[in-house]
């Protein structure tokens, strides 16, 4: 698949990676079939050729999740990006959202180690950042307790925090990728 993205998007992404201290390192990119992570994949594929591995976590909580993971595998294959599908060893129990998140990050950490990737890229973006701040404010955090999504947390980096959801959708659309799912 031939990918040509707007130079302004590539420049912004490259600058974000530089600010995060990971412009020259290997990146494990967490990718679902949503536009956010697919845009992350497309940008990283252009800026980090040969230094990128994509990983899709299939929690096996929905009947269509395996097909969605295979769709991502096909996109990665077409882009020439190595891709792995990760599945939890144990059933997700307790608070589903919290348990799934913990399992996902544990799987990504192990995969990054196995793939010799120094960083794990996730697709949190500016709209997520605003939503997080508003939710914390609504819960009564107050100005002193307000904090957004961190751009870096250990080996996890979030280079899209300055991109809007609309821009990420535009990136996908510009190369003919239509996301299937947007959780």
Predicted regions, residues:
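Core alpha/beta nucleotide-donor-binding catalytic domains of modification enzymes
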Residues: 1-183
């Amino acid at each position: 698949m031939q990918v040509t993205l707007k130079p302004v998007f590539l420049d912004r992404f490259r600058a974000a990676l530089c600010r995060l201290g990971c412009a020259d390192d290997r990146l494990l990119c967490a990718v679902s079939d949503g536009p956010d992570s697919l845009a992350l994949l497309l940008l990283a594929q252009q800026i980090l050729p040969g230094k990128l591995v994509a990983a899709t976590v299939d929690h096996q909580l929905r009947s269509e999740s395996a097909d969605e993971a295979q769709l991502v595998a096909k996109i990665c294959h077409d882009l020439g990006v190595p891709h792995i599908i990760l599945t939890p060893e144990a059933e997700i129990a307790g608070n589903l959202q919290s348990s799934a998140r913990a399992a996902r990050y544990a799987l990504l950490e192990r995969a990054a180690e196995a793939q010799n990737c120094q960083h794990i890229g996730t697709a949190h973006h500016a709209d997520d950042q605003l939503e997080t701040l508003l939710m914390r404010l609504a819960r009564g955090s107050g100005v002193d307790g307000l904090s957004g999504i961190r751009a870096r947390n250990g080996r996890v980096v979030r280079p899209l925090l300055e991109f809007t959801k609309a821009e990420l959708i535009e990136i996908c659309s510009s190369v003919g990728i239509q996301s299937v799912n947007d959780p």
